[in-house]
Amino acid sequence: MANYAAMTGWGMAVPERVLTNADLERIVETSDEWIQTRTGIRERRVAGPGEYTSTLSIAAGRAALERAGLDAAQIDTVILATCTPDRPFPATACTIQAGIGARRAAAFDLVAACSGFVYGLNVATSMIRSGAARNVLFVACDIFTHFINWNDRNTCVLFGDGAGAVVLQPSDEPAGLISCVLGADGEQEDLMAVDAGGTRLPATPELLEQGRQYVYMNGREIFKHAVREMAASSLEAIRVAGLSPDDIALVVPHQANLRIIEATARRLEVPMERVFVNLDRYGNTSAASVPIALVEAVEQQRLRKGDYALLTAFGGGLTWASAVIRWTA
């Protein structure tokens, strides 16, 4: 059994349609200045006809497989982190498994909202370390724009759609996940949620008329919890890894809001020059935001072989997760 699970392949996929702040000005009472000042977002990608969680995930997964130099038949496990599956069941990971041709792979979904990538990275790494898996395709994807009330300017300006994927394989040298800290607070579940569509509140015409199928959030409370928990779990993950913040080459945070990212960086005493930000172009892509940012950071050579990176995220649930990874590709 291997001690580590290296990321040997990576890829991303986003919808073709770009929705700018100027476009939103024609949909809801808002302005480019208002959105950028409060969020840092300029534009986001929005899924169109024929673009689903599965299709974006398959595209990102294929890119990751190509980068890893693996055939889909070599994948033994497919994991999808999402809270916006194609259907309530079966698992969308099964659709991905069939779509990429990984016929022999086990497949399952994992739900941890915007923290999903870091949660899933821990699960995939644990499977490889235990010997339960060798070649894992791990995808994080969300299509939140299908759960948005486009008349609610407090939420419709925030979200975008996308997918990010990594291939994980056994490694004897320190690689991939070095430390990980996960957390949750179910008592705060109502701070951000979609009410209708589950077993508690099955979707009915009455609930749909009330708009209960759309995401809602308490932005002020989410901000406070996010900064506190992302910073605390980040510092703990760095400590467990036996490092200091100065050893971290790049922080790759969940891309929810620029103010949250900046406030978290201040608590870590890490300059923004060492924090990767791309939410201005994609908005909040939920579980996909960290892997999309990671892929772009690698492509822009912000991460090099041997570097330590900090991944940190926060989402509905409430959930939060931070991890130190060592990049060896």
Swiss-Prot record:
BP terms from Gene Ontology: fatty acid biosynthetic process; secondary metabolite biosynthetic process
Organism: Roseiflexus sp. (strain RS-1)
Subcellular location: Cytoplasm
Subunit field text: Homodimer.
Annotated Gene Ontology cellular component terms: cytoplasm
Protein name stated in the entry: Beta-ketoacyl-[acyl-carrier-protein] synthase III
Domain notes: The last Arg residue of the ACP-binding site is essential for the weak association between ACP/AcpP and FabH.
This protein's pathway: Lipid metabolism; fatty acid biosynthesis
EC number in record: 2.3.1.180
Catalytic activity: malonyl-[ACP] + acetyl-CoA + H(+) = 3-oxobutanoyl-[ACP] + CO2 + CoA
Coiled coil segments of this chain: none
CDD domains cross-referenced by the UniProt entry: KAS_III
Keywords: Acyltransferase, Cytoplasm, Fatty acid biosynthesis, Fatty acid metabolism, Lipid biosynthesis, Lipid metabolism, Multifunctional enzyme, Transferase
Role played: Catalyzes the condensation reaction of fatty acid synthesis by the addition to an acyl acceptor of two carbons from malonyl-ACP. Catalyzes the first condensation reaction which initiates fatty acid synthesis and may therefore play a role in governing the total rate of fatty acid production. Possesses both acetoacetyl-ACP synthase and acetyl transacylase activities. Its substrate specificity determines the biosynthesis of branched-chain and/or straight-chain of fatty acids.
Molecular function GO labels: 3-oxoacyl-[acyl-carrier-protein] synthase activity; beta-ketoacyl-acyl-carrier-protein synthase III activity
Pfam families: ACP_syn_III, ACP_syn_III_C
Catalytic residue positions: C114, H254, N284
Residue ranges, annotated region (ACP-binding): 255-259
Keyword Electron transport: no
Family: Belongs to the thiolase-like superfamily. FabH family.
